Amino acid sequence: MAREKFERNKPHVNIGTIGHVDHGKTTLTAAITNVLAKKGQAQVQNYADIDGAPEERERGITINTAHVEYETDTRHYAHVDCPGHADYVKNMITGAAQMDGAILVCAATDGPMAQTKEHILLAKQVGVPALVVALNKCDMVDDEELIELVEMEIRELLSSYDFPGDDIPVVQVSGLKAIEGEAEWEAKIDELMAAVDANIPEPVREVDKPFLMAVEDVFSITGRGTVATGRIERGIVKVGEEIEIVGIKDTRKSTVTGVEMFRKLLDEGMAGDNVGLLLRGIQKEDIERGMVLVKPGSITPHTKFEGEVYVLKKEEGGRHTPFFAGYRPQFYIRTTDVTGQITAFTDRDGGNVEMVMPGDNIKMTGELICPVAIEQGMRFAIREGGRTIGAGVVTKIIE
């Protein structure tokens, strides 16, 4: 029991390993657990445990993801590793595994490859705030100058995607030798984790952000007024506070006259709570599913945005045929479907494409028929007749 209590005293951070196939992401993940297990800060996970990750479904998309957990002296980590490249793309776009930071694994024997670049771009697009580089397989390169060249190449690559390439720590490691118990390489894993502790910022707790709750349901209580229910996404709301109702119709203000959870009255509701909020002077018809209740002035509704989208394959339940610019699906945003149009799209690197095939990964411009509270970094699904055909993340608000 003592262990449980100990764990909660440390801040919790979500991280993951990213990088090119066969550069050693999974081996490095196993090495971290092996080295930390010797200090009692992790359970040993071997390569096969992590590589045989079960399939998970997120927004109707099948993703293979392995989750391991471990501690350092100052933090508790949840660490995600994906076996396949397609799994990373899906994972990062759907936000199935939200990352507060990532360890970019690059083999010193190869240097940066196609997926190294793609994962850095994805990390930038979906808002992974910080990276640390693990230069892996350094035991296989005798020439120190060669290692320095690879490091320079990685730093330039990071800078080209607007990460601070000159400042990001690059640690020389060998996942395999660390697992085999060679002391000098075990020490390098400690050095890597110290870099992660120091360079991946602690996430702002949801409860410290401005209040937001997406409306799931609305009903009237005779003699008391209108109640909106939903799960508080972030922040805190107190009885007597003013809020704004944003999206679909014109923004309007109201005052919260009651907060109720499990039929009990509360003084306040906080991030993660499923609550009913009693709103003063609001009729049932003024408010509907898909609107959000927010701290006044903290969010404005928008109709045009850019997004990074993964389009499901036919085997994943997606479309069987391609679509073209002007395609009009529904965008499922927070709690509701909003009709919109995909007005333009390019491939990942901004190259022109005529049409979008099932299984593609694109950048797109979307326009909604009514303004909704969308924000940069927010996830959405693209649906057609109630079934998901794509998943995306908002990369930029246009208007």
From Swiss-Prot:
Residues 136-139 are annotated as: G4. GO terms for cellular component: cytosol. Its EC number is 3.6.5.3. Its main location: cytoplasm. It catalyses: GTP + H2O = GDP + phosphate + H(+). Residues 19-26 are annotated as: G1. One of its GO terms (molecular function) is translation elongation factor activity. Keywords: Cytoplasm, Elongation factor, GTP-binding, Hydrolase, Magnesium, Metal-binding, Nucleotide-binding, Protein biosynthesis. The keyword Metal-binding applies. Residues 60-64 are annotated as: G2. Residues 81-84 are annotated as: G3. Residues 174-176 are annotated as: G5. Transmembrane segments: none annotated. It is found in: Cytoplasm. It holds the Pfam family GTP_EFTU_D2. Residues 10-204 form the tr-type G domain. It is an enzyme of class 3 (hydrolase). GTP binds at residues 19-26, 81-85, 136-139. NCBIfam families: EF-Tu, PRK00049.1, PRK12735.1, PRK12736.1, small_GTP. HAMAP family: EF_Tu_B. PANTHER family: ELONGATION FACTOR TU, MITOCHONDRIAL (PTHR43721:SF22), ELONGATION FACTOR TU-RELATED (PTHR43721). GTP hydrolase that promotes the GTP-dependent binding of aminoacyl-tRNA to the A-site of ribosomes during protein biosynthesis. This is Elongation factor Tu. It comes from Synechococcus sp. (strain RCC307).
